[in-house]
Amino acid sequence: MSATIISGSLIASKFREELKQRVKILSETWMQPGLAVILAGDNPASCVYVRNKAKTCEELGIRSEIFNFPGDISQKALLQQIQDLNVNPEIHGILVQLPLPGHIRIDEVIAAIAIGKDVDGFHPCNVGALVTGHALFHPCTPFGVMKMLAEYDIPLQGQHAVIIGRSNIVGKPMALMLLEKGATVTVCTSRTRDLASHTRNADIVVMAAGKANLLTSDMIRTGATVIDVGINRLADGRLCGDVEFSGVKEKAGYITPVPGGVGPMTIVMLMNNTIEAAERAKAVALAGGWHSSVQ
């Protein structure tokens, strides 16, 4: 058998059309949604990600502002920029591109973002609300994964999902979202002893370990759904995920490719969250309140 390929690119294209309509309505009846992206330093990968986000904003009709700071920016200056954006009524979403320079206290920076503009879903209040199933915004990558699973009608209720990776960005929120849908969730890391004993029992495997080709075909059960969040660059310059794609696709039931899998959905979910933030701000403004942010 050969797995059905879950194309994030195709699903993202479908969502983009829906998002364009929502942006059009907002722009015609209120104001253009606005996203601010803060970049500190010249990390090549971060620069590429920020350009891709700006390009997607332009395609959808979202106003984007990129604040590109040198790598030696002070904590105080960075926090002041965030506070300025928090009270800017034309900015509805604020994203701080990670990683930040080593001298910056990341937790303090993320916590400074107004909750109603935290379109990455990383603010401590949003993370806490995610535990109860009432997050204002869902972190973009796991949110995109959930949309992909839903698009292909992959059942979650009662299914055993194994996540490899425990990051605050993917692994932990992914576990909470799957739990919310009734899955039985096991969280592992790349250092979990006898990792294969866990993955072989999984109906769904989500790879987010950041280790190239970690999951091989002998580590999954026949027909399993395999979601590859990892993106790694090999010595020859090629991109690959955490899954040994050519072998695993011959045994899995569903699988995401790298590139063209989860990546496009992450950006689309960021756009969705930005539009949602603008829609909420509009509702508050029309009700006679201040539409800038929720502090």
Swiss-Prot record:
PROSITE patterns in the cross-refs: THF_DHG_CYH_2
Amino acids binding NADP(+): 165-167, 190, 231
Pfam families found in the cross-reference section: THF_DHG_CYH, THF_DHG_CYH_C
UniProt GO molecular function: methenyltetrahydrofolate cyclohydrolase activity; methylenetetrahydrofolate dehydrogenase (NADP+) activity
Subunit structure: Homodimer.
Catalytic activity: (6R)-5,10-methylene-5,6,7,8-tetrahydrofolate + NADP(+) = (6R)-5,10-methenyltetrahydrofolate + NADPH; (6R)-5,10-methenyltetrahydrofolate + H2O = (6R)-10-formyltetrahydrofolate + H(+)
Gene Ontology CC terms: cytosol
HAMAP family found in the cross-reference section: THF_DHG_CYH (MF_01576)
This protein's pathway: One-carbon metabolism; tetrahydrofolate interconversion
EC number: 1.5.1.5, 3.5.4.9
UniProt cross-references to Gene3D superfamilies, sorted A to Z: Leucine Dehydrogenase, chain A, domain 1 (3.40.50.10860), NAD(P)-binding Rossmann-like Domain (3.40.50.720)
Purpose of the protein: Catalyzes the oxidation of 5,10-methylenetetrahydrofolate to 5,10-methenyltetrahydrofolate and then the hydrolysis of 5,10-methenyltetrahydrofolate to 10-formyltetrahydrofolate.
Protein family: Belongs to the tetrahydrofolate dehydrogenase/cyclohydrolase family.
GO BP: L-histidine biosynthetic process; methionine biosynthetic process; purine nucleotide biosynthetic process; tetrahydrofolate interconversion
Domain of life: Bacteria
Naturally occurring in which organism (per UniProt): Nitrosomonas europaea (strain ATCC 19718 / CIP 103999 / KCTC 2705 / NBRC 14298)
Sorted UniProt keywords: Amino-acid biosynthesis, Histidine biosynthesis, Hydrolase, Methionine biosynthesis, Multifunctional enzyme, NADP, One-carbon metabolism, Oxidoreductase, Purine biosynthesis
Designated gene of the protein: folD
SUPFAM superfamilies: Aminoacid dehydrogenase-like, N-terminal domain (SSF53223), NAD(P)-binding Rossmann-fold domains (SSF51735)
The protein, known as: Bifunctional protein FolD
